[in-house]
């Protein structure tokens, strides 16, 4: 026997409920499925925006008669009568202070005064009223209470996903996203449905409710609108294109630059805004032969008579211009920018391209860009100079074919570094050296007559003797396998297959043109010191120019066996020879697969 909750007398509702507006009365209502506790809220301005029921005030709220259901106003009082006869008309309705909002007559949870004290008002409703209620709800039936997926389900109407303080806004157009208000919070409820999967009992006991179709997408929240965090690039001219005339001028107000601010899109937005730039009739370009050295100046001067009179007060601007014309061009000189018509260029939006200065040395244009990485480090530069001096390529050329580098190397080899320092910066070729005489060297700055005589004598000898015959480079010379094996100190050629690590062996580039093992660090390895690696993984050993190439090969093998063809020096011990023959008889080494370090 369950205890019946406290029931107030009938006159309590009529007297105290209207006088004291802070009283909240909970009343149990009998239903077929389960007892439903209806929370009775008094008529406050916070609720007055939700549901006008009078006919005279329904025109202010378009969502009442609109064909689109407003999910903001759908609540649990759809389960009871919401017809116009259910309005609570009280002749003794107290006057509320004006807050800028019109007052309406609202039902108390949709219960009419004739039925608000009846515990079984569900049974007293007629079929016409239920049909009217269902028709205005625009749902086929009040379903979703028992968790049926095919029916619309009840969603919680809370302050986390909606705001009942916000004004009732009609449904926006489909292409435009809804305007989010700042005081809305994120939807923190992680449940898709409010019904538990294990129980058929609906959870009607927490807060207000609204109808929501399961298959229909809900009102997008702020978290959904801000879900895309990547910056998007959009052109605002597609949204509101700026109309332009045929002359290129922007039609519209010229007082300010109009930039639209759109708040419906995510925060991280990269916008491309069309900015209005007032132009003259033409864009002035300075002709130049160099690519990318065009100076474009967009002027905003108006063709008024006063502009031509202001040419006397001109601005002097220092410009750097590079032209390949035959006419002499003043570089780094103050230049007055003015049009051919005499209009002064006072526009601050002038776009100038980056141009390169003319080099003082003509030959640096070709040599500075190539091999720039080699000139950055001093060690590489000195090594390159030593290699050129050792190779002495100028000796194998005729004087007519010499370049500036060949001339400088010849002077350095002749112990004339002072003369070479004087010639740096001149565009000298071998053809110029054929016309040298004592007077020419004096004009170049060689003041000592003895040095001039010595220089001319060496040059005449080189011209008479001609270029030296080309010699084969010993370092790059290909040595045949016959020449290598013919060495008397080596008498064995072995085929070895073993996995290695980078710490097992130490190699160097030997005199035979291939890598030679200098130290064996690993244990139980078939390799020995002084072994020459003739072939490594079916590649000729002479292709491995340095130990770093073998180290990279060992690292890339990742523990796999590496095949070596080894040229080994003969030994005096017969025991070692027999062990070496046994290891090389099958062509595969008997060493363990994982050498110990």
Swiss-Prot record:
Residues 179-189 have a biased composition (Basic and acidic residues). Residues 293-313, 581-597 have a biased composition (Low complexity). Residues 165-197, 278-344, 576-597 are annotated as: Disordered. It comes from the Eukaryota. SMART domains: SAM. InterPro entries: SAM, SAM/pointed_sf. Residues 169-178 have a biased composition (Pro residues). Residues 402-465 form the SAM domain. This is Uncharacterized protein C05D10.4.
